[in-house]
A protein has these predicted regions:
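Carbohydrate-interacting/catalytic domains
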Residues: 20-42, 46-78, 84, 117, ...
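Active-site-proximal helices and loops of the catalytic beta/alpha 8
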Residues: 24-29, 33, 193, 203-287, ...
Length: 452
């Protein structure tokens, strides 16, 4: 206990010193809307895989892409874990980003703490935000806590630190240990006070107790109005302080609709489930791909193949209570699974989807009808097994979305007179007349109309 107490005292002294040096960064307050940082309300998230993003795989090399990402409309950069990776029981050559050996250090493959602080400042100078991936459920197999604080870990039947699932390169943390909890919170505070980040994406958040999250997030928000994203879809997560969660059920239903296994209107059942289960202000991070789905399940090049991707991407960008995600390389697009444990550089060359994403992200930023709390009304425009159409409205702003979620051309009729007129087609860049006259929409087609 003396060793633990000394360790915590040292951490406190370090954090206080850093806090004093970085008080201007930490004390900066941002507006809150619906319980969330205002900047995320009509924002978006772009997941950065530093290892694979450039040939160098460093912070400094990634920084060269900031201008391009800013121009595309990216607002929040989520960096996959930037901590050192354990060498014991390492998987593959480079190991899993999620087997952390030291919570308050930088992966030397990416650079050093000076490089990271410089990158955060560059991102902030571009008007963007930074969140980092955090791994609170488990550590790497040679994390320093294993020797310094063996009581921080769950024990298996042999008395050794336990392994969860097939994650043999990790060791399971024990959340019954309150000293461990305080140490975890102290480590998270380090990144806010020392580097000025704007929040965390928390890995396997669903396996960490809500009581911890309430305590942790409460303390962190006394320092800065941060954004908190949970990997998980349990209702207790937003109730414990998280701003956003993963809508896994919606993602899997999207996959089924894309394969023709379920009708388009099946998406409504998941939306209704979300409305019923979560607090009214809870945000959903909608996506067509992320690092897990790409590496292990062929997203989006396999699950939303070719032209199938676009209408579902529009869906993720325009749904209520949503914050859309774009994963590294989707704007190219990368048409392969990016390895999890080996080097496989993404080549940015054609950027075939960049204009498509820019159009959507620009609309989200400028139009209040895509605020999380803007109204959502389904619209009948034809065959509901194939067509998914809806209107979003807020503060006199209105967006009309039509998606053909099928591999066949469909006939559309807009009966609602309130939608008639000459709205702006954001993808065509022109105003188009809408009436009750029938018209065709191609397979996997999409249209988004902005009423001004």
């Amino acid at each position: 206990m003396k060793k633990v107490a000394a360790f915590l005292f040292f951490q406190l002294i370090v954090l206080q010193a850093v806090f004093c040096q970085s008080a201007k960064t930490v004390s900066a307050k941002t507006a809150t809307v619906n319980g969330h940082p205002a900047w995320i309300e009509q924002g978006n998230i772009y997941e950065v895989n530093v290892r694979q993003y450039t040939a160098e795989g460093t912070f400094n090399a990634f920084a060269k892409h900031l201008g391009r990402l800013k121009q595309m409309g990216v607002q929040t950069l989520w960096f996959m874990p930037i901590n050192p990776i354990s060498k014991v029981d390492r998987k593959g050559t480079l190991g899993s980003y999620y087997a952390v050996s030291d919570y308050t250090a930088i992966n030397p493959e990416f650079g050093n703490i000076t490089d990271w602080i410089r990158l955060v400042k560059l991102i902030h100078n571009q008007g963007m935000k930074v969140i980092i991936d955090w791994v609170p459920n488990h550590t790497g197999a040679d994390n320093r806590w294993l020797t310094e604080h063996p009581d921080f870990f769950v024990k298996d039947s042999t008395g050794k630190a336990a392994v969860m699932f097939d994650w043999t390169d990790t060791r399971q943390l024990n959340y019954k240990n309150t000293v461990m909890q305080d140490s975890m919170i102290a480590a998270m505070k380090y990144w806010i006070t020392n580097t000025g980040i704007d929040g965390f994406r928390c890995d396997v958040a669903w396996n960490v107790p809500g009581t911890f999250w309430s305590k942790c997030i409460g303390q962190l928000r006394k320092m800065k109005n941060i954004f908190m994203l949970a990997e998980g879809d349990s209702a207790y997560l937003p109730k414990s302080g998280f701003d956003a969660v993963y809508p896994w059920h919606m993602f899997h239903m999207m996959e089924k609709v894309a394969k023709g296994e379920r009708p388009a209107f099946a998406l409504d059942s998941i939306k209704n489930e979300i409305d019923a289960i979560y607090p009214s202000n809870a945000l959903q991070m909608y996506f067509t791909s992320n690092h897990d789905e790409n590496s292990w399940n062929k997203a989006d090049y396999g699950s939303f193949r070719g032209a199938v991707h676009a209408p579902f991407a529009v869906f993720t960008q325009t749904m209520p209570k949503g914050v859309p995600l774009i994963y590294s390389g989707q704007e190219e697009p990368v048409l392969r699974a990016i390895p999890f444990f080996e080097k496989d550089t993404i080549v940015f060359n054609k950027l075939q989807r960049a204009g498509f994403y820019k159009t959507l992200l620009s609309l989200r930023k400028r139009n209040a009808a895509l605020s999380p709390d803007a109204s959502f009304t389904k619209v009948n425009v034809g065959d509901s097994t194939a067509l998914y159409a809806f209107v979003r409205q807020k503060a006199g702003k209105k967006i009309f979305v039509i998606l053909n979620l099928s591999d066949k051309e469909q006939t559309i009729t807009v009966h609602d007179k309130s939608l008639h007129g000459n709205p702006y087609n954001i993808f065509m860049g022109t105003n188009e007349p809408l009436s009750n006259k029938k018209w065709k929409i191609e397979q996997w087609g999409y249209a988004v109309y902005e009423y001004k």
